[in-house]
Amino acid sequence: MLDMVIAFDTTGSMSAYINAVKTHVKELVPKLFSSNPDLRIGIVAFGDYCDMKSKDDFGRAYQVLDLTDDENKIIQFINKAQDTFGGDGDEFYELVIKKITEETAWREGSTKAVLLIADAAPHKVGYSYKGIVSNAQIDWRKEAEKASKLGIKFDTMTIDHRYVEWYKELSAMTNGVSVPFKNSSKTSQVIEAAALSRGGTRTKDLYEATMDSFAAMGDIEMSMVYTAYSKEVTY
């Protein structure tokens, strides 16, 4: 039983990644559910504080579809997700971690995982922005600790070398997986790897066959992704 949230940074620098998923989403989503009927998927598409309409209205800054097995809802939500601006270099990842942990309708007894598709770093404690947020006291490490206690794993993709250490620390703190990855066109394949690795015995054979296929093709990047996720596979 897998509850998986896919969280997209929708700011400008990440547009190629979410667009790649939009390109393949009609094939990807049915494939994920056909391999694992006990799967539930949630989607979060987010920007930063500067994308909020007001301090009380997230607007397009935080777009969310809670966990569901409705394939059409997932496909439509991803295709309609709005781009955001992002403003400064850091994004409100600290808030994303907090909201996903606290607000997702996680099923009791499920494997709980979040794939964070992002390329920046979280804001530091004390961050302020133009009346939207003032001296924010959200500490991403404390939020990661809360997630870890609830058994929620945060996976990360080391897209930008400047922030590799924070990606790895977040995943390590939550017992998630940090994968070396940059090729936006293969984003949907990383999502598939994450889902297959945690599908239990029913997806183990497909996971291994897919990993072997990438190795045979000489696809080094995807082979590294599958190697990283191998620790999640149930044998």
Please tell me what each predicted stretch does:
Residues 1-235:
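Divalent cation-coordinating acidic motifs and surrounding scaffolds
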